[in-house]
Amino acid sequence: MVGEEFGTVLVRVEDSKGREFQCEVTTLRKDGGYTDGRRPDNVTFGNDIAEDLARRDFTINAMAIEPMNGLLGEESPSGKLIDLDGRGVKDLQSGLLRTVGQAEERIAEDGLRMVRAFRFLDQGEGGLREFDPELSIAISSNIPMLSKVSRERIWNELQRILSCSNSMLIVESMVEHGIFEEILPGISINTNTSMSNDYIVNLALICRDEVSGGAEMSDKIASLLRLSRKESSALSSLHECREIDLDPSVESVRRFSATMSDTQKSQILDYMRGLGADMEDFESKLKQNSVLKAGSGPLVDGSLISEITGLEGGKRLGRLKHWLHRIQVERDLASEEEVVELLAEFDWKNSDFEEWQGLSWP
């Protein structure tokens, strides 16, 4: 069952060739009244397709198909199109987004429909749909209603918008309509950037002008949008990269490979591209040095270093271990012996251990 309380079940079916498909089957529903501008007071199961379609938000979503000769998995599916509004097909073909009924009424029922409308602007390679003028006006004049909508619902829609093929164009339209002034107050939105396919990267890119540090910025946005800890951490790390000058040296690239997960690498590279950084040299070196001979872990531990140097447990021993790990990675050393030989290269007994750099990037 998926969403059983909403009358939705997952059905597995087989076509004539034995291929298995899954589809969601949802009971017809009808809404009660809307009194809080967030959601219907109650939703009841129904048996009338007309009532179900009448409760939809946009004309392109207010259509259904009545199967005539099977649909799923069939080579020649057939069915009867139900477009009771009468404008769904036309709007779908012309790329127009408009509401079922009066736009003011639909928006007043559920403020989230304002954000949801922007998601439905996306047509992939087909570019953007256009707002019906009535819908555009209704959105701009009802922005304060978003304060009634839960942050979680808004973030769920924004994630999907930031994952769209045309996310930058949609963000521009959201800025023009005043959406971000309500959902991200005090955050300057940058619309002059090249977006990726990663919604967290794209969120970091459009918020790149925020002057506060990564942790402060991500905490602020996390409280406004209810980001998860993982999302907030990634946003913070990316924001800290905004002023980095990529060092394409082999040492830097190896440290990048050793300290970042595959997801982090992908996100950072996408983010730097979005900022317009020159990535060619760095990415070329990364391809050549992505695999380290000994992996990313240290070849020597604190016990061995203590045995060789006579150092007891403490900050000096700990910093020495981390320094050796850094040099191991930067030089791509392959054996314990090679790492131990590094001890002869500098005065680890008397130099200031606070200046010894451990493995990190950048």
Across the structure, where does each feature detected by a protein language model lie?
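Catalytic cores of the polymerase beta-like nucleotidyltransferase superfamily
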Residues: 1-362
